[in-house]
Amino acid sequence: MNVTVSHIRSALQECYPPREAANLSRIVCCEMLGHSHIDYYLGKDMILSPKDEKELESILFRLCNFEPIQYVQGTARFLGRTFRVAPGVLIPRPETEELVERMLEEVAPASRILDIGTGSGCIAVTLSKELPEAEV
């Protein structure tokens, strides 16, 4: 089936303001369905297999029910790394990134660090990668 970028954007504009719908449509097309960024911005049609067509329907349904894009994708970005998330795991927040950046500035390299209620693991993994001498 041929699907246009404008079709996806229009479907999302029924639920979201235009700028947010445009951003979500780019994520859906390029990151989730594998459409190239160039083809996306040129507005080229996507040819979807029946499986991808069902996936698109599911994605649009979930987004129009205001499920966070991170849960729909199954991933969230945190300080340049990608972490798996699902509805039972809190989505890493920018404020948490700021906290970890501050810790990286102030914590001694060989510190002992405990992350309680680790969720996605973004704090512990990032601190462990950035402070290899620390015990996390």
Per-region residue spans from a language model:
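A general structural signal for well-ordered alpha-helical segments in protein cores
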Residues: 5, 25-26, 56, 69, ...
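Conserved AdoMet
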Residues: 30-106
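Non-catalytic accessory regions of SAM-dependent methyltransferases
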Residues: 1-35, 39-41, 45-48
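Conserved SAM/SAH cofactor-binding pocket of Class I
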Residues: 95-136
